[in-house]
Amino acid sequence: MQVVSITGASSFIGTHLLERLSLCNDLHLRLLVNRNPNLFLQESEKVSIIRGNLLDTKTLNSLVETGCIVINLAYLSSKSKQENLEVIHNLALACREVGVARLVHCSTAVVVGNSRDNVITEDTICQPLTEYEKTKLEIENVLINSLKGKTEVIIIRPTAVFGRQGRNLIKVADDLISLTPFITSLKTALFYKRRLNLVCVENVVSAILFLMQINDRMDGERFIISDDDERENNYYDTINLLASHFGHKPVKAFYMPYRYHILRMMLTASKRSNVNAHRNYSSKKLFDLGFKKSIQFNEGVRRFGSWYNKSLLHN
């Protein structure tokens, strides 16, 4: 039985991943959790729960074993760059020492930083601007360089992941519910067809599972997963998809001259890395391997809208 060890199992992506993995009968899951895990899976013959701290080398050593597959979803957002790099160095060392077969590391597509390219691929030169982007890129490089020739490392770079219990799209939905129709139209006129670079969490999970199971050796390869191939993945169409699901009237956007120039200046002033309203992230490299998404963008937005509505009713 294949052993799969997971860090960040109680995270947003981790929760959705466990739902899919729980349906697999030929896997033994080893889950690293904190003291109060929010997991729907209980310890059993096929599920081992390791309680501990990512900064503790003993915890990491107890998580991995020879020949296992590691899925790393963890990032310590409240910790410093140095502490996050310490975790990664310790994880890499643990993988080397026991002989982990493959490590699938979940990074982020925004490591590309403030590139001016309209289409971002895995070959786009990264120009990270924020500390988060720089840390995430350095983590990728540490894993690849530390485990080269020892453990196969595959990096997955999702764009803005949304879905049930996720934070992306919350602001758009909140604005639709709370702002006046005029302010909503004004904001929509400004953002209009600006690409949102969203990706359904279901598709991120499918990509992780695909790369976990692929037979070809992909050591050191990076893969973007995005729903930017979907035309509606922009502000105007997405807010109207949500409006439809909420039973609201369509949001209209009046003409605003030089809207994207104004938006670029606003985003630049707020020190955002991506000020390009037309940026798309390409998943062609992943698709060329035979990967198929599990859900279309419109359906993902519908599911998010349904969860959001239920959340409002419970609050």
Segments (PLM) and residue ranges:
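NAD(P)H-binding glycine-rich loop region in Rossmannoid oxidoreductase-like domains
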Residues: R51-N90, A94-R96, V111-V112
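Conserved Rossmann-fold NAD(P)-dependent oxidoreductase catalytic core, especially the SDR/UDP-sugar
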Residues: H89-Y132, I154
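N-terminal Rossmann NAD(P)H-binding glycine-rich loop of SDR-like oxidoreductase domains
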Residues: V3-C24
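Conserved C-terminal active-site "lid" loop/helix of NAD(P)H-dependent oxidoreductases
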Residues: V201, R222, I262-K293
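Mid/C-terminal beta-alpha module of Rossmann-like enzyme folds, strongest
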Residues: A207-S270, R303, L312-L313
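Amphipathic terminal alpha-helices
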Residues: F287-D288, I295-N315
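NAD(P)-dependent short-chain dehydrogenase/reductase
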Residues: L147-L196, V201-N203, L242
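Active-site Tyr-X1-5-Lys
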Residues: L129-R157
